[in-house]
Amino acid sequence: LLGVLSAAAWYLPQLFTAGSTERLARKKPVVINVGFLLERLPLWFLPLSALAAPYSPTLALIIFFAAYAWHGLGAGAVAPAWSDMIARCFPVNKRAWFFGFTAFIGTGIGILGAAFSSWMLVNYPFPLNFVYSFLLAAVSITISWFSLALTREPVRQPPANAAKSSGASWQKIMVIVRGDHNYRQFLITRFLINVGRMGLGYLTVSAIFFW
């Protein structure tokens, strides 16, 4: 379920928000203001779900999945504005460096965070181990929000061919999918890759259970 929420919540909302995002002269207000409410704030409910677990496991699961879905859908809804803001701030010849460098640093910090979370899960009793892990995630993503708020976005007028309504946006998407063979093949490839990844979660559970 977490895998489905993670993938669907990231990609699906972008289809509904891309058109309205394209019509905005500035994307930063969406990324900062809307992003805080839809993407950052939900993670602060995860420690509450862990605290509720000893008293009401059902309530804890409801809070957890609701907060996780809220976070995922919010991140997907804001993603077009974030991507456009990054494109405005970095020229074409610098974007690969930006994404590569940030992915490298983020992965390294993620490894350290995973190791520290594993240590907390072992050394603290339940539910405090999960409370501390979730709290660390909430604090970290909030700190990243403050860094993101320092971004200086160049103001640009919306493109002349920007979709004027949601219906026009969907028509524009269909024209691109039907007319661009390479992009259509790319979408099919991404779909098949994600289908192939469906078994990874079961492999992880099986490894933990048998090994």
Predicted regions and their residues:
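Juxtamembrane/transmembrane-helix boundary motifs in multi-pass membrane proteins
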Residues: 26, 55-59, 93-97, 127-128, ...
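Membrane-interface helix caps of multi-pass secondary transporters
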Residues: 203-211
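Juxtamembrane intracellular "pre-TM" segments in multi-pass secondary transporters
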Residues: 155-189
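Helix-loop junctions at membrane interfaces in 12-TM secondary transporters
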Residues: 45-67
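Substrate-agnostic recognition of the 12-TM MFS/MFS-like secondary transporter fold
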Residues: 1-22, 31-39, 63-153, 185, ...
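Perimembrane helix-loop junctions in membrane proteins
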Residues: 50-57, 92, 148-158
